[in-house]
Design a protein with these regions (language model features):
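Fe(II)/2-oxoglutarate oxygenase catalytic core
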Residues: 1-230, 234-265
Length: 265
């Protein structure tokens, strides 16, 4: 993928960051850390200010899953934008526990950090792909913004996220004074958006996302830097069972889960 649109200079300073919320965080092999932080920058980060038009043409490819909904959108962000998001996440710091996530022992075997992004980051991303998203789900209308809460995962060597389904979530953003995370009223998510921030072109080995059909067949999606995989989630039969397959080698895989919101109010 060619980095067409100009990106903020890599030498721009990062703002300070701090915890805007704490939630119980589940550990990979069981147990809970009661006060697991969710982070934000104290002010918008210039390196995460994305242009509305990034010079690329996102394209949607539907994935056949026996009636379940899943699709891939290419060229969502540029290489430079992906690198900046990874760098931001490393500044917050990855940890074993994942806030607000409940998984049984041995299911989620990776590192996590959750943070709340600004409109200047996720607003342009939504604008680039909105025309490719389902605009009506079960009578609810697509909300014109992605949830600002980003759940990021780093897969080091031998890390895996064993088969699971994603629950639906409320949307989140920051309060006007940026001091706290705030839940959005009347909204629920219908799709997980897995934004791939690196891939085989960066030396990642393994790490495909395996999507299961109802007949237990499957489709494997290899991470491609800048592309995003979407699939239906929630607590019902239409939620897509999936797996973050094992990563091998010295290069870690980075992925961001972002929730696509619908207005049920």
């Amino acid at each position: 993928m060619t980095d067409i649109a100009p990106t903020a200079p890599a030498n721009l300073a990062w703002p300070d960051h701090f915890a805007v919320a704490h939630m119980p965080g589940s550990l990979p092999m069981g147990g809970v850390v009661p006060m697991t932080p969710i982070f934000a920058f104290r002010e918008p980060a210039p390196r995460l200010a994305l242009p509305r038009d990034h010079g690329l043409t996102p394209q949607r490819t539907d994935i056949e899953l026996g009636g379940l909904i899943a699709f891939l959108i290419s060229d969502v962000i540029t290489q430079g934008e992906a690198d900046a998001i990874v760098e931001a996440s490393e500044r917050f710091g990855y940890r074993d526990e994942a806030p607000g996530i409940q998984t049984p022992p041995g299911m989620r075997m990776n590192k996590a950090v959750h943070w709340v992004a600004d409109e200047q980051t996720l607003g342009p991303i939504f604008d680039r792909i909105a025309h490719l998203l389902p605009h009506d789900m079960d009578g609810a209308q697509l909300y014109p913004a992605l949830s600002r809460r980003i759940n990021m995962y780093r897969y080091d060597a031998e890390d895996v996220f064993n088969p699971h389904t994603d629950g639906d979530w409320p949307g989140y953003g920051l309060t006007p004074d940026r001091r706290q995370m705030q839940e959005w009223a009347g909204l629920r998510s219908c799709f997980s958006m897995l934004l791939y921030l690196n891939g085989p072109e960066d030396g990642v080995q393994g790490g495909s996302t395996r999507l299961f059909r109802p007949d237990r067949g499957h489709e494997d999606v290899m991470p491609k830097k800048g592309s995003a995989l979407f699939f239906r989630h929630g607590f019902g039969p239409r939620s897509v069972l999936h797996e973050g397959s094992r990563v091998f080698g010295e290069v870690s895989k980075y992925v961001a889960r972002i929730n696509v919101m619908y207005n049920f109010g």
